[in-house]
Amino acid sequence: MAGGDLADIESLRNVFDAIANKIVHVGPVGSGLKTKLVNNYMAMINNAVTAETLSFAHRVGLDIDATAELMSSTTAGLGQLNTNYTKKVLANDLSPDFPITMAIKDLDMAIELANSFDSERLFGDLAKKLFVDAEEVGMGKLDQTAILTYLLNDQ
């Protein structure tokens, strides 16, 4: 990620190529740092969610290694940007592959299971609140990725 004048970045391409696998121009000066912080924000939240989820799996009696192996090939492990966002909300397609109402139902059941095993569910509770808030403004039948649209319109 590089911020600044595109011509300046191109003039340094050999340097960037030597230290990075991929160079993406992200905007004017300062955009590189902002992008780095936003990227690390998501990475650390994903790390915390992964830890909470694998702890949940362990508490309900699942094998952590088997669960992690399975999840690494599903939307849970591959991430929304690699699976759903590009074909759904970022393509302006909010037709439901997995509607918000179903996300709430599954979160309700998972949170109930977590509660019965005294498992941490901080991120589950936060996610449910976000989906419920979106449902309350009439977005329940839209694809679960529509929470991005909800957040963009809510600010």
Sequence positions of predicted segments:
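Short acidic/histidine-centered micro-motifs embedded in hydrophobic/aromatic stretches
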Residues: F56, L70-T74, L126-D133, Y150
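Electropositive, surface-exposed helix/loop patches at the edges of structured domains
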Residues: V24-G27, T101-K105, Q155
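Internal alpha-helical scaffold of NAD(P)-dependent oxidoreductase catalytic cores
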Residues: M1-T35, Y41-Q80, F117
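A generic structural signal for secondary-structure junctions
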Residues: D17-A20, S72-A76, T86, L90, ...
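Generic detector of well-ordered alpha-helical packing
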Residues: N40-Y41, T53, L107, Q144
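Short, basic/aromatic-enriched C-terminal tail that caps enzymatic domains
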Residues: K141-Q155
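Interdomain hinge/lid region at the active-site interface
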Residues: L33, T83-Q144
